[in-house]
Amino acid sequence: ALDIGCGTGNLAIPLAKRLRRVDALDFSAGMLRQLEENRRAAGVDNLRVHALSWTDSWEAVPVADLVICSRALGVEDLRGALEKMTRWARRRCYATLHAAGDFLGDDVRAALGREVAPRPGYIYAVNMLYQMGFPARVDFLKSTGGMTYADAGQFLEAVRWRIGGLSAADERRLGRVFGALPQTGDGRRRYRHEFVWALLSWEKPGP
């Protein structure tokens, strides 16, 4: 199997316990360092790690019967990423993409007082795959999660990453939102959000 955008190994390590070999690919050195620690702790020795991005050459990465990509298709060239996934698969691909919900909840949107343009959703990928000759099956997964922040600055930076620039008035209002968030045991504040993810799967026809 090949896990693209493997992060710290949440999928790659369990897969490696069940399969003969797993290749895990991510561009983040920090994520891969944590994956190596998690791999050793799990006693897994059939997991190969590749420090690569979507745009790098994958010449050293072997093709696999199964290719997965969980929440790592937020790329500029979505069609190119889907094509690359499919080229590296012998049999089947799975990918999860955003379907509904957002990091920016109603409280943040109200504080900003303006509409935030949604990001391209899963339907773009479904249409692209259909055009490529791979009609995808779609299932939906609900997810409740959240992030913790040590201070308002971290929270503001997370919002800024999502929407771009913030005015001084935006920062003041968002600071009040942050101050009202529940605290965790270590004094950080937790922002909760809910998502719906689309699980896309498609097969490659045999030779």
Regions found by a protein language model. Name each.
Residues H98-V116:
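Short, glycine-/aromatic-enriched active-site segment of Class I SAM-dependent methyltransferases
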Residues R90-A100:
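Conserved beta-strand signature within the Rossmann-like core of class I S-adenosyl-L-methionine
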Residues D65-R79:
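A short SAM/SAH-binding and catalytic strip from SAM-dependent methyltransferases
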Residues P118-G133:
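Short alpha-helix
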Residues N10, K17-T55:
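Class I SAM-dependent methyltransferase SAM/SAH-binding core
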